Amino acid sequence: MSRPVGPYSPFVSAGGWVVTSGQVGIVVGENGPELVPGGTTAELTQALANVAAVLEEAGAQMSDVVTATLYLVDMGDYAAANQVWTEAFGDHRPARTAVAVAGLPVGARCEVAVWAWVDGAR
């Protein structure tokens, strides 16, 4: 899991909840965190991998996600984002909100934040 690019925690646990900070499609490169090349599809694939890594550190997994927020700089990428989303979540279908935004940190084209429930009381 890469370190946050700002003054915040990657996740916070409260009761059975794990709440992640927004994750963008960054990897740790030679010069620190950098966006993966390839546009929104590649960035979202990496952002969701980053979400999975944060959840794992918190003792959760993607199948524990109850709700998610997807931020997109270009809503024209919505259909492609849905395909990446389906690949990441498989048959699991958490609630989701998609929001169009004017910009995101580090020039990202997408960002994902999730809430997961981990104590089994669904």
Where does each model-flagged region fall?
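Short, polar/acidic, helix-capping and beta-turn segments at strand->helix junctions
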Residues: 1-122
